[in-house]
Amino acid sequence: MAGFKQLSGLVVPLDAANVDTDAIIPKQFLQAITRVGFGKHLFHEWRYLDVDGTKPNPEFVLNYPQYQGATILLARKNLGCGSSREHAPWALADYGFKVMIAPSFADIFYNNSLNNHMLPIRLSEEEVEEIFQWVWANESKQIHVDLEAMTVTVGDKVYTFELDEFRRHCLLNGLDNIGLTLQHEDKISAYEKNIPAFLR
């Protein structure tokens, strides 16, 4: 898994609070257990005018031409509330989002996003409002996220954010739970060699 250090990308301004995981990925699309293929169903009930997902809703922000190819999602408070389905960050990642910015995230969704190598950034409501206003006034312009410096640069303004150092280390180095374990492979092997034969 590639490490995440910096990203310059388009921002989709999803002007909604309390966006729950059922809105992010509706329950009828949860049958699969692999992480791919969910992007086409992201925000399905808002994004499409029909059940089959063949008629895009022109009034939904993800369908606006100026936001195609966006890699950063901007939202209001309590993003990812509701059920704890891990399919929600899977769908966001499969669509192409790498960063989410909001005043707050539901705890399980926040951790699931980090586990799936996405960066959820918490900024104050005032800072998020400033970014919304900038994005609306500067459509099709990119912002810059720097995980090493822990900053978000929007136009000529720089915002700082916080992230647990362990989580930051994992993102910077592209480490998931398996990768973290393999960092200690030599110690695991040494321990296993000392296990009595009758316990192996």
From Swiss-Prot:
* Top enzyme class: lyase
Among CDD domains, the record links this protein to: IPMI_Swivel (cd01577)
Which SUPFAM superfamilies would you find in this protein's record? LeuD/IlvD-like
What family classification does the UniProt entry report for this protein?
Belongs to the LeuD family. LeuD type 1 subfamily.
How would you summarize the oligomeric state and partners of this protein? Heterodimer of LeuC and LeuD.
Q: What does this protein do?
A: Catalyzes the isomerization between 2-isopropylmalate and 3-isopropylmalate, via the formation of 2-isopropylmaleate.
According to UniProt, the name of this protein is: 3-isopropylmalate dehydratase small subunit
Question: Which lineage is the organism of this entry classified under, starting from the top rank?
Answer: Bacteria, Pseudomonadati, Pseudomonadota, Gammaproteobacteria, Pasteurellales
